[in-house]
Amino acid sequence: MLELQHIGFEAEGKEILRDVSLTINDRFVAVTGPNGGGKSTLAKIIMGIDKPTSGRILFNGEDITYLSITERANRGISYAFQQPVRFKGLRVKDLLKLAAGKDATITAACNVLSEVGLCARDYIARELNDTLSGGELKRIEIAMTLARGTQLSVFDEPEAGIDLWSFQNLIHVFEKMHERTRGSILIISHQERILNIADKIIYVKAGEVEKYGPREEILPALLGAQTAGACKVLTDKLAAGKEGGARA
C-alpha cells in the first residue's frame, strides 16, 4: 500500500530524517520514539504537508512524492493533527459532511460523533471555534477521519486530550475503522496500550528508523533497553501514561 524509499528531510539546514525506507500495509502500525526524533515529520511527509528533500513515496504503486495534500486525500490518505485546527465559522456537521462526501447525511454525522463519545445533539451544530476544548476538538477530528473511511489513516498522538473519555473507546474506534475500510492505520504514540494493539512498531530516533518489525519482537526489545538508556524517553512516557490511566 504505502512505500517510503530512502526518504530524507532537511529544514533550516538541519537534517530531520535520514534514509527512511518502509513498507506499510498492516492493519495497525505504531510509530514511537524519543521526542524530536522525527516521528511527526514522517507523518507530515506521508500526508504531503512537508515534502521530502530526497527519496520517493509510493501509494498503491503510484509515485505520490510531489502530490498535494488534496491529491493524496483524494487517493485515500487522511491525517489527524496532534493539535487539531479550529475552523471559525464552520460547524461540526458541515465538517463531517465534507469529510464523508456529497452523499453524507446528518444522521451519519451524528453516528460518528456518538462513536467518539460525543452527544450528537449537543455538538452537531456547534462551530469549530474557541468554545470547544482541545479534547473535544481532538474527538471531532477523529470522528472526521472515521467519516472519511480512507485506505490509510494517519494519527499523530490521538490519545492527547481525551482523558475524560475512555482510552478503551479510542482503541475500539480504531478497530471499527479498520473493519469498515480494511485499510491501514498509522498511529504516532508513546502509550503502551496503543503499542500493544499494533501489528508492527516503528521506532524512530535521531531521524532514523532504528527498529521496525512485529510488535512481539519490537516492544519487548524497547522496554528491555531501558537499563542501557537507549529507550529512556519512551519508558518515561509509558510510565506517565500508566499513572494517568490509574487516576482516571
What are these regions (language model features)?
Residues 83, 89-105:
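Q-loop/switch helix immediately C-terminal to the Walker
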Residues 63-78, 222:
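ABC ATPase NBD coupling module
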Residues 55-62, 108:
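Conserved ABC transporter NBD signature motif
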Residues 47:
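Helix-to-loop junction immediately C-terminal to a conserved catalytic motif
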Residues 154-158, 165:
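Walker B catalytic motif
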Residues 32-35:
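The feature captures the beta-strand-to-loop junction immediately N-terminal to the Walker
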Residues 208-231:
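Conserved beta-strand-loop-alpha-helix hinge in the C-terminal portion
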Residues 2, 15-19:
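Conserved structural motif at the start of ABC-family nucleotide-binding domains
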